[in-house]
A protein has these predicted regions:
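ATP/nucleoside-binding phosphotransfer catalytic cores, i.e., glycine-rich phosphate-binding loops
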Residues: 127-128, 133, 159-162, 169-213
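ATP/NTP phosphate-donor binding region
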Residues: 1-8, 15, 19-20, 24, ...
Length: 213
């Protein structure tokens, strides 16, 4: 018998362990030691931790519960996303990440920029009794104020256990200059409601015209 499952790795490794535990109905505390490239999830808990401090917390700290999302039968503890740049995390080679760290993600994303921005997804989304629709270049449902290594100012008050997930949907635009301004606004917290949907909810349904990734 085990008292705790200890995970060393990045956001993806932790997510795989959470999925296994949820699907197999395993109820044990997870001790997480971040050892990946971005480690967004750990930053929401302790941004300045060290391996020694994480080990002390695992050995002597008190377990706590946090929100886990479910998307088409797959669980996520950090983020579920579609559209531009979402392939970057799994298309970036392990060798590149070892050499360049987070820069490997950035270079991969820049290399795929034209294809990413041309990936438009038309969909309806339903939340809190409201049905809306649009065509989007990017969408994310997250449980963290940081996504892809970037902190989102309008989600600064987000917590892991508030029963809500943060939703971000960015409209597809053919004008690259306008799209650049919109994305810059997302990064700085100055969002344009004409092009960006940003809200919190405990449940959201997406209805797409075609398979989306």
């Amino acid at each position: 018998e085990f008292e705790t499952i200890v995970v060393y790795g990045g956001d993806g490794t932790l997510n795989r362990v959470v999925n296994i535990m949820m699907h197999q109905d395993i109820h044990l505390p997870i001790g997480y030691i971040p050892g990946g490239t971005t480690n967004d999830f750990s930053k929401a808990i302790d941004e300045n931790g060290t391996i020694e401090s994480y080990c002390r917390t695992i050995a002597f700290g008190n377990p706590f519960s946090y929100d886990v999302g479910c998307f088409n039968g797959t669980y996520f503890n950090y983020v579920a996303a579609f559209g531009a740049f979402t392939a970057t995390s799994y298309e970036t080679s392990r060798e590149s990440k070892k050499i360049l760290g987070y820069g490997a993600y950035v270079l991969n994303a820049l290399g795929n920029l034209p294809a990413s921005l041309s990936n438009h997804t038309k969909m309806k989304f339903i939340h809190d009794g409201v049905e809306e629709e649009g065509t989007f270049v990017f969408g994310a449902i997250s449980n963290s104020p940081s996504v892809g290594g970037f902190k989102l100012p309008f989600y600064e008050d987000s917590t892991l256990d508030d029963g809500k997930f943060e939703v971000l949907l960015v409209a597809a635009l053919d004008n690259l200059e306008v799209l650049h301004n919109v994305l810059s606004g997302v990064a700085t917290g100055n969002i344009d409601p004409k092009y960006v949907h940003a809200f919190k909810t405990d449940k959201i349904e997406f209805i797409c015209e075609e398979d989306t990734a």
